Amino acid sequence: MTKLSSRDIKKIIGAVTTVIAMGGAYLAKEAVALPFLHKSNETPSKTIKQGSTSNQDKTELNQKEFKSGMAIKEDVNSGKSTLNPSEWVGPKITYSPLDSENRVGAATAYLTKENYGKSEGREGQKWSPTGWHNQALKVNGKRVFPQNRGHLIGYTMTFNLDNDGNKKPGELGSIDNPKNLFSQSSYSNQVTFQTYEEMVRTSIKKGSKVTYRVEPIFKDNELMARGLWAQAVSDTGDLNFNVYIYNVQPGVEFNYSTGTSKANPNFEVK
């Protein structure tokens, strides 16, 4: 056997060390790269899931059909808002522009106590939202006006904001703002929706910061909304709801394509 010199031994040790170092670097690279790839695969999945939850809610609401005898409202997401109170950016309101059919879209309000107010006299409303046909009907012997100009964000919660939703001290509220009005049944407005509006008013009057979103749900190209999706959450935890309210009226049937209506004494709303 040939005896290795000390110089040859050093060369061999150096070569082995290099190989080990290269292998270690590769393994280290893989150890770093694989968790990164795994994480990058998880993040889009989570984002898609979060986005689809909201979209799924709206898709399901679009598919709902009210039948005589049903309840006028139902909870969405078990009645819990999906809004994030930590993203409050107010006081302001973000209105949607009118769409190609001239229909109103969602409005998201970031409200405080300074947005609550009352005025001694309200200006008249001249704007006619899509589907506006408020001719009186005789229902069960009574004269009924089936529609209201419904506010997405209630008039008394829009003080000190202009019609674009930006802060403007001294403004007396959004009365006749096309981006805040839709054709709403008088029953859903005055009996049902008003209950939730009062919950929001109570919260901001107590000093809470409230994130509040309201969206009319239209089907296809219909001019009158089938319902109203409303949710709100406060920074103090005193307010949290998520509800869908059908745009219906006892004793009245609406043609949602046009907003016209006819009396039907057998049409029931619970």
Predicted segments, located by residue:
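N-terminal, intrinsically disordered, polar/charged segments of Gram-positive cell-envelope systems
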Residues: 31-91
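N-terminal Sec-pathway targeting helices
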Residues: 2-15
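Hydrophobic membrane-insertion alpha-helices, especially the h-region
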Residues: 14-29
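Domain-level detector of nuclease and nuclease-like folds
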Residues: 104-270
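Polybasic, low-complexity association/targeting segments
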Residues: 68-117, 243
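Alpha-helical interaction segments
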Residues: 16, 55-56, 78, 122, ...
